[in-house]
Amino acid sequence: MKKRAQKSKKGIDMFGVTFFVFIVAVIGVLGVAFYYQQTKASPGEPSTRVIKKTQEQLKSELTIYPTLYVTGSSGTPKNNISHLVQAVTNKNNTAKPGLTVIAETGNKYKLRITGKIDAGNKYPAIAVGTDHGTNNHEIYQYAIKATIEYLAAHYNVPWYNILGYSSGAGGAMRFLINYSQDKNLPPAKKFVALDGEFNRKEKLRANESMESLYQNGPENKSADYNYFEKNYSKMDKGIHVYLMALDTPVGSDFDGVLPWSDLFSVYNLFEKNGNVTEKFTYTNSPGERYSHGSICKMPAAQDYIEKVFYSST
């Protein structure tokens, strides 16, 4: 009986050890998952940088009028925005290559910056991306905010332009809603949405037309669109807005990934806010096969963007 009791006690002890190890392992897995979510998925918020300068400081700094080119959900500019920047800055205009800025989304949007802005470069192109791919508009909002704050801290920036491609356009709109009237930051002059994603691919309803969408907004509304609809009036009314959309195949009201009911879903909001708003649609020429993922390489899109940003500089 005594030996049997000892065996039973050992069995209980082994069970207790095994159960303890199991609990520790579960806690560890949950901890890693929580850390991953915080560093990879959570928008977080960058530290606020309040920039105040004297007139003497402003006079001594290089004055620039930058244009931010914000990438899409891949995060990296090299597959899309870099082609657009290269094409635009190679044309006969005032634009020149400037900086490539990558925001570390899990590190309070610390910026990794390459390139330089030379003394004679008044209209630098700034490519903006993130260290991890995302279609979260809030993450892009903070990446843009950190970039603008960096530029304002190191240069005299009377104003800037901004282009957002795909998900980056939704992020740019969210940034403009929340920060375009922030007196600590320079004002935005023009906003271009290149095949911008605002309404999570929501399509027209059976009885709905694009004309009714332009007049009244979409009937199918995503959570992102609901945010824009609730907050659009916070955006600076002086910003000139350009919404661009590819049509492929011709007459499909589709860019290969996103329907026009998404790309133009916010047109009505800009109109109601009093922003001068223009729509630009384009199609493939014979022999061309551009779609949403390659639109930054399309000559027609590049030419229009150059005209918008640099025709009067």
Predicted regions and their residues:
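N-terminal Lys/Arg-rich, disordered targeting/topogenic segments
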Residues: 1-14
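Generic detector of short alpha-helix boundary/capping microenvironments
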Residues: 16-19, 181
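Hydrophobic membrane-insertion alpha-helices, especially the h-region
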Residues: 18-31
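Lipid deacylating catalytic domains
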Residues: 34-38, 44-163, 170-313
